[in-house]
Design a protein with these regions (language model features):
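Well-ordered beta-strand positions
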Residues: 122, 161, 165-167, 173, ...
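C-terminal long alpha-helix characteristic of the crotonase
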Residues: 124-129, 180-228, 241, 257-265
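Glycine- (often His-adjacent) and acidic-residue-rich active-site loop
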Residues: 54, 62-96, 109, 139
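CoA-thioester-processing core
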Residues: 90, 94-96, 104, 110-163, ...
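Terminal low-complexity tails and localization/encapsulation signals of metabolic enzymes
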Residues: 1-9, 248-265
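A general structural signal for well-ordered alpha-helical segments in protein cores
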Residues: 73, 87, 147, 156-159, ...
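Conserved CoA-thioester-binding segment of acyl-CoA-metabolizing enzymes
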Residues: 1-63, 187
């Protein structure tokens, strides 16, 4: 199911470029449609990399010309509670991943593909990208956690429009409603995703990234940031040398060398 071989035919492939891990959905002949086993694999990969201090950024992308055309329809015909559990597990693992996650979208990003993209922190697309949430075409109920994430990202009106109509939208509208954060021409998109991931992984404080992600997510969920969360990250800051290093690097006009690598708990 999982391999580090970039030439593999396995449906999930992980490649590494220093501190950047890339998770490839690798069924290009099926537009990277996701099977139950792939949902389970995504959860397992996220669990492994969440505590791997050599991994600073996770990029999710599709092999070939498409990101992900959604769930494998053949499996939906015989899906049961275990399929729903696998889907929920992947969504939770990706959405709660403590380090920055980037979805790199080209071509189809539909149904479960949109669910994966929304679970990531940042979505970068090229101009071939097409998005949709399409359960209304199939007569199925979209997962509640997927609806919840979509509403929090897009707002209720845009989410209802996508769910009610099952229409596919291009990058222009996706950018307008906040479904993607950046769009680039195909020739420039790969270079941009590499540069952005490298920036996050090598020149920015992981302490700032993880604390910001935790506080933003908590604020979205509950409407506030608890004192316990504030105290936790205050303690991490006090125990870290990153703040002193950041100030010194700024004054000395050099790139910072941040050393914080993960929470102490």
């Amino acid at each position: 199911m999982l391999t580090d071989d970039p030439g593999s035919t396995e449906p999930l492939v992980v490649t590494h470029d220093g501190p950047i891990a890339t998770l490839w959905l690798n069924r290009p002949e099926k537009r990277n449609a996701v099977t139950k086993a792939m949902w389970e694999g995504i959860a397992a990969i996220c669990a492994e990399f969440a505590t791997d201090r050599t991994v600073r950024v996770l990029v999710v992308r599709g092999a070939g010309d498409h990101f992900c055309a959604g769930a494998d329809i053949g499996e939906l015909e015989v899906s049961d509670s275990s399929y729903a559990a696998a889907n929920a597990g992947a969504d939770t693992a990706l959405g709660s991943f403590p380090k920055p996650t980037i979805a790199f979208v080209r071509g189809s990003c539909v149904g479960g593909g949109t669910q994966i993209a929304i679970a990531c922190d940042v979505r970068v697309a090229d101009t071939s990208a097409v998005f949709g949430i399409t359960p209304a075409r199939l007569g199925i109920v979209y997962p509640a956690f997927g609806v919840d994430r979509a509403v929090r990202l897009l707002g209720p009106s845009a989410t209802k429009h996508l769910l009610f109509s099952a229409e596919l939208i291009g990058w222009e509208r996706a950018l307008r409603i906040g479904l993607v954060d950046e769009v680039h021409e195909p020739a420039a998109a790969d270079e941009r995703i590499d540069a952005f991931a490298t920036l996050l992984a090598t020149q920015r404080s992981l302490l700032t990234q993880e604390s910001s992600k935790a506080m933003v997510d908590e604020c979205v969920r509950t409407g506030e940031i608890s004192r316990a969360t504030q105290a936790r990250w205050g303690a991490e800051l006090a125990a870290s040398t990153d703040a002193a290093e950041g100030v010194a690097a700024f004054l000395e006009r050099r790139p910072p060398r941040f050393t914080w690598a993960g929470t102490s708990d």
